[in-house]
Amino acid sequence: MSSQNANLMREVRLFENHSEREQMENLSELFAVLNALEHLEKMFSRDHVSADEYKSECFKLIDQYKVTMRLVHGATSIEDFAKKYRLHCPAAIERIREGRPITVKDDQGNVLKHIASIVEQFITFLDALRLNTRAVDDLYPGLDDLYNAINTTSRVPIDAIVTTKVKKWHDRLSSMAASDEISDEDARQMIFDVESAYQAFNKALNELKH
């Protein structure tokens, strides 16, 4: 075999180390989940699956998305991911934004439950910061849950300041390595920003009651 042919037969490496391999696997998993969710939406719209089957599978895929998205380093939003990897999945993105199957109504009970969840996530994340949690892999999951909760409902009043301040730190942490730690100065500013967002959220809720 000639050297030229040998070079052609040589394995093409998609990663250089274990960390890059995990990132590649996580990206592939996220791509597969979104693709599956898009196909599920189309199948349900064409009556190829029952409502119960659709609901069960949709919840499962949304949960898989949440877990996988946390593991993908540097992914700031599902829209950016789909655009970067040329994945056309508008139905899947809409389902992820709403955080529920289309058959599950966003009734008052769900709204109140969602509000309570956001409040709890605000408090939990602020408590972690005040208890001197500084590692990115400890802080990011809680902040990601909060960020996604804020962005997956249309009926909870979200002031612009809430989204802006939370997104600022979500983007910052998602660009850092899991082993990194934020400085005490950054932690102080993060507490101030997230606390401000929390107060703005509560203010919007109070105005809604009146």
Curated annotation (Swiss-Prot):
Limits of the VPS28 C-terminal domain: 110-206
Subcellular location(s) per record: Endosome
Annotated Gene Ontology cellular component terms: ESCRT I complex
Principal location listed in the UniProt entry: other
GO terms, biological process: protein transport to vacuole involved in ubiquitin-dependent protein catabolic process via the multivesicular body sorting pathway; receptor catabolic process
InterPro entries xrefs: ESCRT_assembly_dom, Vps28, VPS28_C, VPS28_C_sf, VPS28_N, VPS28_N_sf
Keywords (A to Z) from UniProt: Endosome, Protein transport, Transport
Superkingdom: Eukaryota
Pfam families according to UniProt: VPS28 (PF03997)
Gene3D superfamilies referenced in this protein's UniProt entry, alphabetically: 1.20.120.1130, 1.20.1440.200
Entry comment describing in which tissues the protein is expressed: Expressed in embryos.
Molecular function GO labels: protein-containing complex binding
Ranges for domain VPS28 N-terminal: 1-106
UniProt similarity note: Belongs to the VPS28 family.
Subunit structure of this chain's protein: Component of the ESCRT-I complex (endosomal sorting complex required for transport I).
Role description: Component of the ESCRT-I complex, a regulator of vesicular trafficking process.
Protein name per UniProt: Vacuolar protein sorting-associated protein 28 homolog
